[in-house]
Structures are given as C-alpha cells and as structure tokens.
Amino acid sequence: MSSHVSNNSILDPVTFWNQANKSLIRYGGDFAPKIIVRAKGCCVYDEQDNAILDFTSGQMSAILGHSHPDITACIEKNLPKLVHLFSGFLSPPVVQLATELSDLLPDGLDKTLFLSTGGEANEAALRMAKVYTNKYECVAFSSSWHGVTGGAASLTFAAARRGYGPALPGSYTIPEPNPKLSPFRDAKGNYDWQKELDYSFYMLDKQSTGSLACMIVETILSTGGIIELPQGYLKALKKKCEERGMLLIIDEAQTGIGRTGSMFSFEHHGIVPDILTLSKSLGAGTALAAVITSEEIEKVCYDNGFVFYTTHASDPLPAAIGSTVLKVVKRDNLVEKAKISGELLRSDLLRLKDKHPLIVDVRGLGLLQGIEIASCTDPSKPSDFLGTVIGDKCLELGMNCNIVHLRGIGGVFRIAPPLTVTDEEIHKAIEIFDSALTFTAKEFSGSY
C-alpha cells in the first residue's frame, strides 16, 4: 500500500515516528528519540536545531567531524567525474589511495583491496587467510565484534549469536585479556595474561582438527567494553600464530587513522600483522574499507584462485575521499592532536571517577575511552540499566555518548569524539556527563 508524505510534514515528530515505525526494519535495539536533520563539526542537529555533541563520531567513523570542508570539496570535485565502475576497471583515485597507504604502512603491508564496510573487509580477510593457508579454522576473542555477515558473524562473540542457526565450521574463541575478569593469576595474585594465553592455545589445539588458518583481533576491543591488549600480548599472540602456520589479522575499524594517538594502533605493540583491515575512520563517515596484506600473501591467494567480487570493490569516489582523509589527518597533525586531546579527555574522566562512585573504571587510549558504570548493588559488574539511564540523560542534555545498548555491556560507555574535537567541546561533554551521573545517582541509589 502506498502513502505520500511531504518533506515538510515528515518533520512533524508525530508524523515522522509514525512513518518510521510503519516503514523501517529495526536492526538492533530501539532508535534514539531524535530526528537528525543536519550535522556540522562535532555536533548533529535535530529538527528544532538543537545541537547534540556527537561523542561517538557517528558510527565511530567521522574522525574529521561532520561536513568537513575538505571532504565536501572532494565530493563536489569528483562526483561529476567518477562515482562507480565495473569491478574489473581501475581508476586513478584507487591506485593513488593504495599507494598512499603502502607508503604509510611498514613493509609487509603492501597491497590493498578496497571495499565498503568493516564487516565486508573482515570477510575478505578471512577468505584470504583460508585460501593462503589452505585451512579453514578461524579464531577470535570471546568479546569480539567483527561484523554480521557469515564468516565475520561467526567470529563475533560479544553479542548477536543466537537465533541465526549454526556458525561456520571451525569458528573458535579464546578469552580476551581482561584483567578484571580473568581467573589467571600469578603467585602474588596479579593478572597473568601469558599463562592465560598459553592455556587458551592449549585448549584451542585440543579442539582443532589441524586446520588453523588465522586469528582476527582488535587492539582495543570496543564492543567488548574498551579492553586494551596489554603490552607484549600481541607479540606473544603473533608467535603463537606463527608456530601453527596461522595468519594474524588485525581489525582496525575503530582504532585506525589516528584515533589512539598513533596512525595505526598496532604500532603501539611493535608488530606487523599479516593482514590489516581498515574501515570506519578511513572514509571518515563514508562507505570505504580496505584489506591490506603483503605481496607474498596476495600472490599466493591470486595463484590459488582468490575471488571477492562485490558491487563496490574499487569504487573511485570513496577512494578519492580516503585520500582526502589521509591528507587532512597529516596536514592538520591530527594524530598528535588525538594523543593530546585524549590525555585531556582521560584526565577529565578520571576526575569524574573520583567524584562519582558509579564509575568504577576509565580505560582506553587516545580518543577512544571507556567508562565502566557499576551496579549500585554489585560494583564488580557493569550495569546495563544504569548505563541506559545515563546514556538517555546525556542525550536529553545534548550529548550522544553511546552507540548501542547491548545486553551485558550496556554499562561501559565508548567515548570517541572526532579527532577535530576542541577542548571546549570536551569540557562541555564532561559537564553533561557529570549532570547525568548526578541525576542517576540521586534517582536510583541503592535500587540497582
């Protein structure tokens, strides 16, 4: 049944939500109760032109903020010339961006495949690992999120596993190094991640049929609650993979292109992955992703018949935008700015932690920070309910600070403003978060 709604009437809130509820598929929780009509810099604006600080950078993607003038100019320049091509055609923007990434990255990350989303990039990376090793078993952390398509979804263990039937055969998990939850301790009671890693691979070897192809990891598990891998862990993990002939895939959807105070987060750990995937931040809010690997791995995959035809592989317009993103990040020194702004953000969050007992931990790196909200009745566990209350109050007061409310991790806020965020915007966000915490403590103290 067709119905016509004019552009003017759809901005009436009642009409808008009636049409939304009638026409849209819900794809993960409820929609935020705001009608967003434009975005600029670090803010989005509703239909009444109220500014909302965007401390999730859209979907953890808009690292240059919204409507950045260089991105706008790039689109205006390239849109009349080249947008989309047959997947077998190449264009100058694609070759240029691949060359720029190769120049930025260390040896061993030399060749690039351009796609649209992080899940798609991880899917391609997993297929490459299987073709290269001629094996099929893949491993991820128990709080991982790598996408919602077949292979990526099979290796997403944080949430959204039930109700979809069996995962792909050979999909395994090991515990992420979480010092708060792990039972592995040394003689003094300190967390022993090496012992945990050794035991994890002992159990993995027991389950494997001898066909281990790869492990895929984030350097900071974002959906898992902002869990940062400890220093030394990635080196030890890579050694475990090499001993078994496995490839190590690092998924930098959220940490890549400067967010952690380094251009790529794996650089903090002194290793080079076999395959690197980028998405979200590479396009700064536009649909661009990349799979990057060595010449040797690419050649073996090609010789073995690797195929990943997809509609928007090597599209020229997103590639042109990606080059512009890299240009702006380097020109405006945004990697160093993310480090400095991240230190300011972290110090302000720690000040809030000292003031509010509801905050039990502040963790993260650069402009990717996590705030764990504990239950009033059980400080050892993040509180889904209180996290939702605080997040909703922040939105009411003018800040978006959480992407989704997932069961079991709703009490860990992911704070990830654009790299262009100002000191004043950080302080304003802290004021809002302070007010939301004060409200929640007053309303629900002793109840949850």
Curated annotation (Swiss-Prot):
GO terms for molecular function: pyridoxal phosphate binding; transaminase activity. Gene3D superfamilies: Aspartate Aminotransferase, domain 1, Type I PLP-dependent aspartate aminotransferase-like (Major domain). It comes from the Eukaryota. One of its GO terms (cellular component) is mitochondrion. Pfam families: Aminotran_3. Keywords: Aminotransferase, Cytoplasm, Mitochondrion, Pyridoxal phosphate, Transferase. It is found in: Cytoplasm; Mitochondrion. Belongs to the class-III pyridoxal-phosphate-dependent aminotransferase family. This is Uncharacterized aminotransferase C1039.07c.
